[in-house]
């Protein structure tokens, strides 16, 4: 079983795809393939970020209650 790429690896791959597409010298079929890969990577990255955000919102305050991250940040 292959290891899952890290967030940083996926982000780097997405940046490479974006750079290739921005240069505009990629054949159409390859550009479409790269675009599809980029969309899939973007969705994976978004899911990872949402998971991290949910983890951070479970920060505990002094009373042991869970508080949303925005409230914890405002209390500092």
Curated annotation (Swiss-Prot):
<keyword id="KW-0378">Hydrolase</keyword>
<keyword id="KW-0269">Exonuclease</keyword>
<comment type="similarity">
    <text>Belongs to the XseB family.</text>
</comment>
<keyword id="KW-0540">Nuclease</keyword>
<dbReference type="Pfam" id="PF02609">
    <property type="entry name" value="Exonuc_VII_S"/>
</dbReference>
<dbReference type="GO" id="GO:0005829">
    <property type="term" value="C:cytosol"/>
</dbReference>
<protein>
    <recommendedName>
        <fullName>Exodeoxyribonuclease 7 small subunit</fullName>
        <ecNumber>3.1.11.6</ecNumber>
    </recommendedName>
</protein>
<keyword id="KW-0963">Cytoplasm</keyword>
<dbReference type="InterPro" id="IPR003761">
    <property type="entry name" value="Exonuc_VII_S"/>
</dbReference>
<dbReference type="GO" id="GO:0008855">
    <property type="term" value="F:exodeoxyribonuclease VII activity"/>
</dbReference>
<dbReference type="InterPro" id="IPR037004">
    <property type="entry name" value="Exonuc_VII_ssu_sf"/>
</dbReference>
<comment type="subunit">
    <text>Heterooligomer composed of large and small subunits.</text>
</comment>
<comment type="function">
    <text>Bidirectionally degrades single-stranded DNA into large acid-insoluble oligonucleotides, which are then degraded further into small acid-soluble oligonucleotides.</text>
</comment>
<dbReference type="GO" id="GO:0009318">
    <property type="term" value="C:exodeoxyribonuclease VII complex"/>
</dbReference>
<dbReference type="GO" id="GO:0006308">
    <property type="term" value="P:DNA catabolic process"/>
</dbReference>
